Amino acid sequence: MQLLLHSIYRKIDENRILWYIFIQYVPRKAVFILGNGDKLLIEPVAYIKNGYKEKFGVPRQSGLAPSVKSVIEFCDGYKDENMLRDIEQYSHLWLVWGFSQNNGQWSPTVRPPRLGGNKRVGVFATRSPFRPNSLGLSCVKLEEVVNAKKGNLLIVSGADLADNTPIYDIKPYLPFTDSHPQAVAGFSEPVREYALNVEFCKELLSKIDFSKQNALIKILEHDPRPSYQDDPEREYGMRFADYEIFFRVLDDTLTVTRVEVI
């Protein structure tokens, strides 16, 4: 790693070396370079816990799997219950978080999954993780505030964050300013109606805890495969909670072939 960091230092300026040291290799703490000498030091205030044990299978946007619940656990130094005072008055929250499972460099153009993974568009016209500052923004539904001995917890639903993703900030969703029903979504518009038919035989489905069945089916409906992979003969696999789920996709139908308990 020392040789790699040394080569980066020789190729790019001092500001960018800070980016690679703190973001790419140590994503849990971050120093972002915002401009000419302007620095913002951020660190996680919380981590999210859920059944998305790997990025393969995580919904591509928040709200696509509303039945999946997650727990937000606050870090030491951010467990003061006063920080959550009156938060229960809001139905939805914004989460500012880091792409902790993204080890790639940012790119000026990216290939959105819903364009087949072939057409390139500008990174700022997408929600791709390959961004100059590796930050994500998601709207989740606040289900419950739990008082626990080790600090308050937030139970949320509809998150598109992998398990143990660092959260840097939490803000209330304000429908009178944040909602724009007449907004135009460009090439992302067809995603709203996209869903696969899921064939899940009773024998295999019975291996899944009943409380997790609907959530898993919803995840599969939105096609967890990488956009560039479309081989009907290939058996794909993804991990969800304590299970390995294997499946094939033909046209608009996803068929679960195996379920293994981890």
Language-model features: where?
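Cationic, low-complexity basic patches in intrinsically disordered or flexible, solvent-exposed regions
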Residues: 2-3, 25
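Arg/Lys-rich, positively charged N-terminal/basic patches that mediate binding to nucleic acids
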Residues: 31, 37-81, 87-89, 173-218, ...
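Active-site-adjacent substructure of cysteine-protease-like catalytic cores
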Residues: 38, 83, 87-136, 228-230
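Short, conserved beta-turn/loop elements at beta-strand boundaries and strand-helix junctions
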Residues: 53, 145-151
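Short solvent-exposed strand/turn elements
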Residues: 150-173, 260-262
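A conserved acidic, glycine/proline-rich C-terminal tail/linker
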Residues: 213-239
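Enriched for short, Lys/Arg-rich terminal
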Residues: 250-262
